[in-house]
UniProtKB/Swiss-Prot annotation:
Stretches of the chain forming a coiled coil according to its record: none
A biological process from GO: translation
Keyword Ribosomal protein among UniProt keywords: yes
Family according to the record: Belongs to the universal ribosomal protein uS11 family.
Function per UniProt: Located on the platform of the 30S subunit, it bridges several disparate RNA helices of the 16S rRNA. Forms part of the Shine-Dalgarno cleft in the 70S ribosome.
Record gene name: rpsK
Species annotation: Campylobacter lari (strain RM2100 / D67 / ATCC BAA-1060)
Any matching Pfam family: Ribosomal_S11
Example of a GO cellular component annotation carried by this entry: ribonucleoprotein complex
Domain of life: Bacteria
Single GO MF annotation: rRNA binding
Protein name per Swiss-Prot or TrEMBL: Small ribosomal subunit protein uS11
Keyword Ribosomal protein: yes
Amino acid sequence: MAKRKVVKKKVVKKNIAKGIVYISATFNNTMVTVTDEMGNAIAWSSAGGLGFKGSKKSTPYAAQQAVEDALNKAKEHGIKEVGIKVQGPGSGRETAVKSVGAMEGIKVTFLKDITPLAHNGCRPPKRRRV
């Protein structure tokens, strides 16, 4: 039986100057997605995807590494200006925003909190007893 050749797709580099960085900081993980202005994903990263496991995924350092990884991937597509949209109550949200601002060659245009707030909607989960 003949072996199949594995064909790897080439990354098509797009020239996109402006984009939006979505930071979703949950209690367990931090996910970062870089999109163009229309909302099409260019690059993404997460703390768990970088090898952080268990409770280490929710640390501020893991969030910083996830942001740097996603923005380095996005820089290959020519991103120079980004807006930041932050969602969630996680511990990595402040560090993630700071590390976007500290990235060389990337200018931050706006910062917006898009955390959904319930107006007496669903009942929240019960309190933890440790």
